[in-house]
Amino acid sequence: MSYKLPLFAAAAFLGGYMLISNRQLRVNKYELKVSKLPKNFVGKKILLLADLHKKRYGDNFNNLVNSCIAAEPDFIFFAGDLYSRDETDMIPKLALMKRLKHIAPTYYIFGNHETDNMDNAEALALKLTECGVHILRNNMEQIKIGEDHINIYGTQLPQRFYRNEDFSHHDLPQIKKDELTKLLGEPDRSECN
């Protein structure tokens, strides 16, 4: 009998820790060395966000937005899963993206949760474009500073790379270079991509 209380306490602590750590905003800083980076891009900061799903990070995303402002990014990239596949109300997330766009030019790539429902994905793409967010869906865009530019690419992968028809995630195919080339085209190797 005496072992049940410590076991329960340990399980409760571990469960609470996992819940909290999964909901905390985490900031990682990396410095990248890019050989063909044009001089006007040296020292520029990119803020990468991803997998927001149902998280809010404060009322109206205020903690998230304040962290983004504090980072002083030159560009914001959102790498998919702005919402979860079962969410239907896009208004709060669109308001967040508008706020991010006012911090720095913002670029968006769809994740697997967005592409689970292509009607929602198309509506989201239209609304994001209307508010000035750049959408990367199997295309390249140039980011320019002065006379310098870099090329950025974004894919919208088919669902077969995210899950099987039975919604399982085992033995998923790896995307191959020729498939990426088919989606994005061949990069200009003389430029910064």
Predicted regions and their residues:
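Short, mixed charged/polar active-site loops
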Residues: 27, 43-45, 149
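N-terminal membrane-anchoring alpha-helices
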Residues: 1-40
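Short amphipathic alpha-helices and their capping/turn segments at secondary-structure boundaries
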Residues: 33-37, 63-71, 141-144
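Hydrophobic residues on conserved beta-strands that form the core of alpha/beta folds
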Residues: 27-29, 49, 152
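Conserved catalytic scaffold of divalent metal-dependent phosphoesterases
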Residues: 36, 54, 114-193
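Residue-level preference for short coil/turn positions at secondary-structure junctions
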Residues: 41-42, 72, 102, 148, ...
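Membrane-embedded segments
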Residues: 44-134
